[in-house]
Amino acid sequence: MKPSVVMIEPNGHFCSDCAIRTSAVCSSLDAAELREFEHLGRRVHFSSGETVFSEEDITTSFYNVLEGVMRLYKLLPDGRRQIVGFALPGDFLGMNLSGRHNFSADAIGAVTVCQFAKAPFGRFIEERPQLLRRINELAIRELSQARDHMVLLGRRSADEKVAAFLLGWRERLLALKGASDTVPLPMSRQDIADYLGLTIETVSRTFTKLERHGAIAIIHGGISLLDPARVEALAAA
């Protein structure tokens, strides 16, 4: 299935009306720059499971996530999948040094992105140092998340990994949805396992164990933190 594409018209005001305007890559632009910026992008809608881009593809576009969650992953030589991250609204994808994507991305549920062709986007930022600074900020944030993931994959128990994942995911959602003890988990248990370097059976047992100990409640589409302090102590172990 091909994604449906909606071109951004110059008078559509898609950027100024964007729900993530204040946190997106374009947040550093003024009103006049934003109107020019609208000409560069197009909105693309992906259904659940559709590929946004594939590892080793030549990078021809940048992607600003507007709605939904994306799964970012690499395939190992033996066919196993290692999930390297999950992209949320406001995340900016496509930055790399090699000119090729170094991971694949597909949609978890419905996803909408703002897609920018690489060459005109590059020309646009050359005259706008504030936009380049914003891109650098996003790149530093991505690097920080990658380092956190490396620590998560290190010498930690399954309980510690799952607890740290839940708190880290909750923290990322905080900026989008505000504080809440309910943590939506749009990804599958298999996705979480592939992110943490565990088996799906271990992840499922750990969720059940945390619920049995009164730390969380497993609800439809996610979990509820019943005892955040207990989960925080476990994640910090």
UniProtKB/Swiss-Prot annotation:
Regions recorded as binding DNA: 189-208
GO cellular component: cytosol
Domain HTH crp-type: 156-229
One example GO MF annotation: DNA-binding transcription factor activity
GO biological process: nitrogen fixation
Pfam assignment, any one: HTH_Crp_2
SUPFAM superfamilies for this protein: cAMP-binding domain-like, Winged helix' DNA-binding domain
InterPro entries: cNMP-bd_dom, cNMP-bd_dom_sf, Env_Response_Regulators, HTH_CRP, RmlC-like_jellyroll, Tscrpt_reg_HTH_Crp-type_CS, WH-like_DNA-bd_sf, WH_DNA-bd_sf
Induction entry: Its expression is maximal under reduced oxygen conditions and depends on the two-component regulatory system FixLJ.
Keywords: Activator, DNA-binding, Nitrogen fixation, Transcription, Transcription regulation
PANTHER family from the UniProt entry: CRP FAMILY TRANSCRIPTIONAL REGULATORY PROTEIN, FUMARATE AND NITRATE REDUCTION REGULATORY PROTEIN
Function, as annotated: B.japonicum has two FixLJ-dependent FixK homologs that are activators of the transcription of a group of genes involved in anaerobic processes such as denitrification and possibly nitrogen fixation. FixK may bind DNA at the FNR consensus binding site.
Miscellaneous notes: Possesses 4 cysteines which may bind a metal ion (possibly iron).
Protein name: Nitrogen fixation regulation protein FixK
Species of provenance: Bradyrhizobium diazoefficiens (strain JCM 10833 / BCRC 13528 / IAM 13628 / NBRC 14792 / USDA 110)
